[in-house]
């Protein structure tokens, strides 16, 4: 399955919530009607969505937020289910620990897609070594930094400046001047913002 390359705002409208695909720290709410489905007149049917439909919709939403395709998402769920603890929370922790997401959370990329591009273009170092695998799992204590020759990129500086204004998550420590950060630990469920109901995904895969 190919990765979606169409209008990002349309995906947010389809899910009825801002997926932060277009702009990481600026809401789409003022720019488009998130409660109206894509199309000339939006969805007009008043039919109630089935439980299965809601579960499937939630899975699609989370896949789009993190930019993960179906096969990879299934692997994440299998690993989350294998681990001790709450499966839904484990799933979100695995997704949040992806290198591209950590780069985004540290403010080096204004969106996860931009962060993924930085990783793919070898602009990111992990513990001093170049790593260009967006899905790589980052562990507690890992240091993620911008490669020296990439530090002059205007988009990185602008993204970091905005991230400093809005604040960084408590589970990463960022030195904006050095353009590097430390992944302190995987976030607790309460640390993960966003309109996500992971229990629906667990129910879907438990059918």
Curated annotation (Swiss-Prot):
Classification via PROSITE patterns: RIBOSOMAL_S4 (PS00632), S4 (PS50889)
CDD domains attached to this UniProt entry: S4 (cd00165)
Family matches, as PANTHER family: 30S 40S RIBOSOMAL PROTEIN, SMALL RIBOSOMAL SUBUNIT PROTEIN US4M
Annotated spans, Disordered: 33-54
Pfam families tied to this protein: Ribosomal_S4, S4
Domain S4 RNA-binding: 97-157
SMART domains reported in the protein's UniProt record: Ribosomal_S4 (SM01390), S4 (SM00363)
GO biological process, one term: translation
Biased composition (Polar residues): 42-53
Recorded GO MF terms: rRNA binding; structural constituent of ribosome
The keyword tRNA processing is assigned to this record: no
Keywords linked to the UniProt accession: Ribonucleoprotein, Ribosomal protein, RNA-binding, rRNA-binding
Stated role: One of the primary rRNA binding proteins, it binds directly to 16S rRNA where it nucleates assembly of the body of the 30S subunit.
Protein name as catalogued: Small ribosomal subunit protein uS4
Glycoprotein is among the record's keywords: no
Family according to the record: Belongs to the universal ribosomal protein uS4 family.
Quaternary context: Part of the 30S ribosomal subunit. Contacts protein S5. The interaction surface between S4 and S5 is involved in control of translational fidelity.
A cellular component term, taken from the record's GO annotations: small ribosomal subunit
């Amino acid at each position: 399955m190919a990765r979606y390359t169409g209008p990002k705002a349309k995906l947010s409208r389809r899910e009825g919530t801002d997926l932060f695909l277009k702009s990481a720290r600026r809401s789409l709410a003022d720019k488009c009607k998130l409660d109206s489905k894509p199309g000339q007149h939006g969805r007009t049917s008043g039919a109630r969505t089935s439980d299965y439909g809601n579960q499937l919709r939630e899975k699609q939403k989370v896949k789009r937020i993190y930019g993960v395709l179906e096969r990879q998402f299934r692997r994440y769920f299998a690993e989350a289910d294998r681990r001790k603890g709450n499966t839904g929370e484990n799933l979100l922790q695995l997704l949040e620990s992806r290198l591209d997401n950590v780069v985004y959370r540290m403010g080096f990329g204004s969106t996860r897609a931009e962060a993924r591009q930085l990783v793919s273009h070898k602009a990111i170092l992990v513990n001093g070594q170049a790593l260009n695998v967006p899905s790589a799992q980052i562990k507690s204590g890992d240091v993620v930094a911008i490669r020296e020759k990439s530090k002059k990129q205007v988009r990185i500086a602008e993204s970091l400046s905005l991230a400093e204004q809005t604040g960084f998550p408590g589970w990463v420590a960022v030195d904006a001047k050095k353009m590097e950060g430390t992944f302190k630990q995987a976030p607790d469920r309460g640390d993960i913002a966003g309109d996500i109901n992971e229990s629906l995904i667990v129910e879907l895969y438990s059918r």
